[in-house]
UniProtKB/Swiss-Prot annotation:
Keyword terms: Chaperone, Nucleus
Organism: Aspergillus terreus (strain NIH 2624 / FGSC A1156)
Family: Belongs to the CHZ1 family.
Record-given protein name: Histone H2A.Z-specific chaperone chz1
Compositionally skewed regions (Acidic residues) per UniProt: 39-56, 90-111
SMART domains, A to Z: CHZ (SM01082)
Domain of life: Eukaryota
Compositionally skewed regions (Low complexity) per UniProt: 12-21
Primary location recorded for the protein, binned into one broad class: nucleus
Function: Forms a chaperone-bound H2A.Z-H2B complex that acts as a source for SWR1 complex-dependent H2A to H2A.Z histone replacement in chromatin.
Keyword DNA damage: no
Entry's Gene Ontology cellular component terms: nucleus
Pfam family name, one: CHZ
Record text on subunit structure and interactions: Forms a heterotrimer with H2A.Z-H2B, stabilizing the association of the histone dimer. Also, with a lower affinity, forms a heterotrimer with H2A-H2B.
């Protein structure tokens, strides 16, 4: 009776019916095709070479494109309250939409 507690380890898939269905499914050891791996590596190397060649054609930076003057805010104190008040003054134009009176001529059909 001690044989009932012993596990049977068999590699025969037909002997274990539930294992037979699961043998082909799930995460298994993937087979790798070395020819595909080699070609992918070669493609990556050729792309890297293309990037290196494109960097040699850079033009020098023109001094005309460099901004100088009062546009820099680094090191300056900004009064956000004053800026908010200035923006509120600009929003007054949106209130004009409420005062709009359409013409009654639009009700007539035209030919």
């Amino acid at each position: 009776m001690g044989d009932n507690n012993r596990a049977t380890l068999g590699s025969d898939a037909a002997a274990n019916a539930p294992d037979a269905a699961a043998f082909d499914k799930g995460k298994g050891k993937a087979t790798e095709d070395p020819s595909l791996e080699m070609s992918m590596d070669e493609d990556e190397e050729s792309e890297e070479n293309d990037d290196e060649d494109g960097g040699d054609n850079l033009e020098p930076i023109s001094a005309d494109n460099i901004i100088s003057g009062g546009r820099r805010t680094r090191g300056k104190t900004i009064d956000f309250q004053e800026a908010a008040e200035k923006i509120q003054g600009d929003d007054d134009d949106e209130d004009d939409d409420e005062e709009f009176q359409p013409n009654d001529d639009d009700d007539n059909m035209r030919d």
